[in-house]
Amino acid sequence: MIRVLVVEDMPTARQLLVGILSADPELEVVGQASDGAEALALVRALRPDAITMDVMMMPVDGIQATAQIMAERPTPIVIVTSLDVNEVTLSMKALAAGALAALPKPRGPGSPGFADDARRLVTTVKAMSRVALLRRPEPARAAAPPPAAPPDVPRGRVVAVAASTGGPAALQRILARLPAALPAPLLVVQHIALGFAEGFARWLASAGPLPARVARDGLLLEPGVVHVAPDDRHLGVSADGTRATVTDAAPVGGFRPSGTPLFRSVAAAYGAGAVGVILSGMGRDGVEGLADLRRAGGRVVAQEAASCAVDGMPGAARAAGLADAVLAPDAIADRLALWLRR
């Protein structure tokens, strides 16, 4: 039985979440909290296996509560919030503080999408409760020293990133350390719930010196700009590498967006000028695409296991022998800046 703590300040929404979770035979709601301070006390007393957490609460909000829980007793946290763009942006801050996933609040019973929302909530809570490696957010640390003689860098360059569970925190660390004059566009596939892409892009834009936007089909790719895959769409680049492509092609390995189409696309367009980065996440999405990128002469950076919330995707890339470098997020940023410098 998976023991769940529900944290939500609105009684009606809290009752809805409790009802959905309690209806599943594998889940038991062991406690309910109406703010972050109460949540922390119940985590200490009940030691739940998973937590659903709202972000907009008083006096202690979900971001503060997540940070305190991850520092004191790391527990899988699923953020459940409204799709208001400001709340979505706050949800990203909670992910950076250590939460593993973010979902929109379920629609009420009788709504056409209620069954799908309930199923998604239950499935996500179960999956996150099984995450074996949970780490509190790391303090900043010195980057690994760069190689003495970096390889030559081609003129046309691009950085493609794939991430899932635990990825937002790592990506934030990377973007905060990159130079504003990055001489390449940066494309990001992040597995995230529907409705969260715009808030995710806004949050990334606040994480460092690089502007970030949700990509659209045909968008001109600009150096020093982060281009984020839209909700439920694959992201790639045009054959000449100048524009974004956004498609609703079938999911790859169950994911849309997926890292594999992105990596394959930049491999075909940029060849040796492509750099693939694979960050924390469950499963092995992106690994097949990284193999194509390596065959095209590109380079691959995989996040090290010790700094991952979940070492599935980068671990699979390392196991396949695809990583040219295995680094913590801060060091990934420094290595990218080195490889891409003019």
Curated annotation (Swiss-Prot):
EC number: 3.1.1.61, 3.5.1.44
GO molecular function (one): protein-glutamine glutaminase activity
Sequence ranges assigned to domain CheB-type methylesterase in this UniProt record: 152-342
Protein's name in the database: Protein-glutamate methylesterase/protein-glutamine glutaminase 3
Biological processes annotated in GO: chemotaxis
InterPro entries: CheB-like (IPR008248), CheB_C (IPR035909), CheY-like_superfamily (IPR011006), Sig_transdc_resp-reg_Me-estase (IPR000673), Sig_transdc_resp-reg_receiver (IPR001789)
Record remark: domains: Contains a C-terminal catalytic domain, and an N-terminal region which modulates catalytic activity.
Cell location: Cytoplasm
Principal EC category: hydrolase
Keywords: Chemotaxis, Cytoplasm, Hydrolase, Phosphoprotein
Organism listed in the record: Anaeromyxobacter dehalogenans (strain 2CP-C)
Functional note: Involved in chemotaxis. Part of a chemotaxis signal transduction system that modulates chemotaxis in response to various stimuli. Catalyzes the demethylation of specific methylglutamate residues introduced into the chemoreceptors (methyl-accepting chemotaxis proteins or MCP) by CheR. Also mediates the irreversible deamidation of specific glutamine residues to glutamic acid.
Domain called Response regulatory: residue spans: 3-120
Record CDD domains: CheB_Rec, REC_CheB-like
Positions bearing 4-aspartylphosphate: D54
Transmembrane stretches, start-end: none
Catalytic activity: [protein]-L-glutamate 5-O-methyl ester + H2O = L-glutamyl-[protein] + methanol + H(+); L-glutaminyl-[protein] + H2O = L-glutamyl-[protein] + NH4(+)
Lineage, uppermost ranks: Bacteria, Pseudomonadati, Myxococcota, Myxococcia, Myxococcales
Post-translational modification: Phosphorylated by CheA. Phosphorylation of the N-terminal regulatory domain activates the methylesterase activity.
Residues at the active site: S164, H191, D285
GO cellular component: cytoplasm
Family: Belongs to the CheB family.
